[in-house]
Amino acid sequence: MAKQALNQLTAAVRTETGKGASRRARRAGKIPAVLYGHGTDPQHLELPGHDFAAVLRHAGTNAVLTLDIDGKEQLALTKALDIHPIRRTIQHADLLVVRRGEKVVVEVTVVIEGDAAPGSLVTQEASTIEIEAEALSIPEQFTVSVEDAEPGTQFTAGQIALPKGVNLISDPELLVVNVVNAPTAEELAEEGAGEVTEEPAAAEAEEAGEEEAAEAESE
């Protein structure tokens, strides 16, 4: 199901820029942003933090935003987000100007559904694929079914069914999902034993290195 331009946000034009102004905006519950594209000069904005985060949480980063900027409507896509490494809050957003009917290139999430055959292990090699679609018709996600898939089964980007009007940009041979034989209990036990025996060896090597360093210092 494609997203529609229903994500209304009122954006204020920023009169101050710089780190200090950005910190003040965030303390006031706003998110600093820059809007660019179509040859226009970058426009510095402030977005309502709670509302913007809610749109991304419920509709995803490919959601088309309908911005109200000084009473004028502007469609935009979220191009990049700066996330605080500890608090995981949005620090800044880059927004791309889009127009109705315009095609854009975006990355769309791939999800796995179903249960593979007994004795198999499913690994996801790529979490997204890159596609080209109209800005107002970007798929929310793509689904790969691994129901009853046997070990040795692979799903590439080119095998994912795309809606009409959506073109694949990623390499069609890009491996997205891989079904392999699940490790046996014996293999897991051997792997665990190998890790245990490696630890003392590493400790001995470290001690030897420390002794050599100490001898070198004493000379």
From Swiss-Prot:
One of its GO terms (cellular component) is cytosolic large ribosomal subunit. Residues 187-198, 204-219 have a biased composition (Acidic residues). CDD domains: Ribosomal_L25_TL5_CTC. It holds the Pfam family Ribosomal_L25p. Signal peptide: none annotated. InterPro entries: Rbsml_bL25/Gln-tRNA_synth_N, Ribosomal_bL25/Gln-tRNA_synth, Ribosomal_bL25_b-dom, Ribosomal_bL25_C, Ribosomal_bL25_long, Ribosomal_L25_dom, Ribosomal_uL5_bac-type. GO terms for molecular function: 5S rRNA binding; structural constituent of ribosome. One of its GO terms (biological process) is translation. SUPFAM superfamilies: Ribosomal protein L25-like. Keywords: Ribonucleoprotein, Ribosomal protein, RNA-binding, rRNA-binding. Residues 187-219 are annotated as: Disordered. Belongs to the bacterial ribosomal protein bL25 family. CTC subfamily. Part of the 50S ribosomal subunit; part of the 5S rRNA/L5/L18/L25 subcomplex. Contacts the 5S rRNA. Binds to the 5S rRNA independently of L5 and L18. HAMAP family: Ribosomal_bL25_CTC. This is one of the proteins that binds to the 5S RNA in the ribosome where it forms part of the central protuberance. This is Large ribosomal subunit protein bL25. It comes from Mycolicibacterium paratuberculosis (strain ATCC BAA-968 / K-10). The lineage of its organism: Bacteria, Bacillati, Actinomycetota, Actinomycetes, Mycobacteriales.
